[in-house]
Amino acid sequence: MAAFRLTGDTSIDRAVAPPDSRGRSTHLRVSARARFLEDLDSAIARDPAVDSRLEMALTSPGLHAIWVHRVSHRLWSMPGGRLPARLLSQLTRALTGVEIHPGAQIGRRFFIDHGMGVVIGETAEVGDDVLMYHGVTLGGRSMEHVKRHPTVGNNVTIGAGARVLGPVHIGDRVQIGANSVVVKDIPAGAVATGIPATVRFPDRGEDPYEAMFRDPALWI
């Protein structure tokens, strides 16, 4: 199976639409639509079982969860918005099986394949182009009101059932194997598998994406 690498088109962030008939800028509306389509197209690129935007938009619980999270996260930062944000995230949890705390910071082109059983805590930070499978937990190891959840870099893949716990840092291009338990920092470009997770690096000259696909246990 060929590995797929996503590259962001940052032009949509610079696009500013002309004012509408009342002289109001439509930048926010266009930006939201562009982000919606970006999420949709990146999901299609990662899921060979889906053939169209319509099918993906209607049938992917992972996409539904991240779309609603983008709304609840904005509410979370507004005065008086925290309770509505929590209620919205709990409704999404009931409908999709994906629990993303509205305080979590999620980057662009994030995709949860299959969806069910994913938990992402309040202080988690997730970078761009992250792929996550079902049953993943980005959890805390403290009851204090501090940074207590993981920080995940860009272009990271986290396999089904993996647990990443505490304020650990997961570097860019890391691949975390299915059912692994990560409680320490993982350096960029590494592959982490096992309980507790041990770290290895792809062979010299080997693309880390190809290394991931060499062992199906890393991503199923």
Residues of each region from the PLM?
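Terminal amphipathic alpha-helical/low-complexity segments used for targeting or macromolecular assembly
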Residues: 1-96, 206-220
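Intrinsic-disorder/low-complexity coil detector
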Residues: 17-18, 149, 186, 201, ...
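Solvent-exposed, flexible loop/coil residues
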Residues: 54, 62, 67-70, 104, ...
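Left-handed beta-helix
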Residues: 96, 102, 107-108, 113-122, ...
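Conserved phosphate- and dinucleotide-binding cores of soluble alpha/beta proteins
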Residues: 145-149, 206
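Conserved beta-strand-loop-alpha-helix hinge in the C-terminal portion
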Residues: 190, 194-211
